[in-house]
């Protein structure tokens, strides 16, 4: 696994990883790569297997929701409930094709959250991503009127101390089983999370 910085597109980051990887370490070159995506503005862990069998197995496991993905996020304001489950289907927005929006005719999208801490202005959340739709977390919390901090596309205010391509959303923990072996990868929160929560 490898941490992707926010502002790096998954495809671009994949090419960079391949260019930086010494294939002599593993012998014959094989076409593998990233088995899942993160939004361009989201930071965090990405799985990049170099073995063909592992690559295809992990692809299947992502589709069948066997891989546990956890995120941390900071939202504007506070939520009505400290913990909750958001079960709201998503479609492409009719007004902005870059966005997703809630629709009863959309694809199933389930997000669970728990509030870790909060201030008068912000909430730090631990999020379980049950389904993995594009922009799922961002659209769900916009709907709850608690957008991800600095996520201007989804209704948040611009934070002067953050780059426009950085939002307060991080994939920080992934767990999965592969060929009867358990794997768990975790990373620390980025420094700007503390900056926001101390504002």
Language-model features: locations:
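RNA pseudouridine synthases
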Residues: 6-199
């Amino acid at each position: 696994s490898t941490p992707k910085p926010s502002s790096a597109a998954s495809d671009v980051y994949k090419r960079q990883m391949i260019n930086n990887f010494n294939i002599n370490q593993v012998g014959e070159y094989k076409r593998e790569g990233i088995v899942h995506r993160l939004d361009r503005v989201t930071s965090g862990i990405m799985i990049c297997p170099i073995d063909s069998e592992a690559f295809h197995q992990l692809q299947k496991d992502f589709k069948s929701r066997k891989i546990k993905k956890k995120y941390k996020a900071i939202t504007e304001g506070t939520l009505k409930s400290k913990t909750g489950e958001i079960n709201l289907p998503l479609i492409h927005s009719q007004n902005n094709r870059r966005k997703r929006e809630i629709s009863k005719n959309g694809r199933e999208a389930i997000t669970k959250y728990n509030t870790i801490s909060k201030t008068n202005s912000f909430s730090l959340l631990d999020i379980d991503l049950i389904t993995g739709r594009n922009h799922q977390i961002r659209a769900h919390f916009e709907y709850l009127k608690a957008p991800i901090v600095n996520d201007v596309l989804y209704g948040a205010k611009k934070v002067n101390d953050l780059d426009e391509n950085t939002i307060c959303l991080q994939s920080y923990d992934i767990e999965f089983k592969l060929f009867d072996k358990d794997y768990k990868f975790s990373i620390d929160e980025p420094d700007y999370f503390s900056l926001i929560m101390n504002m």
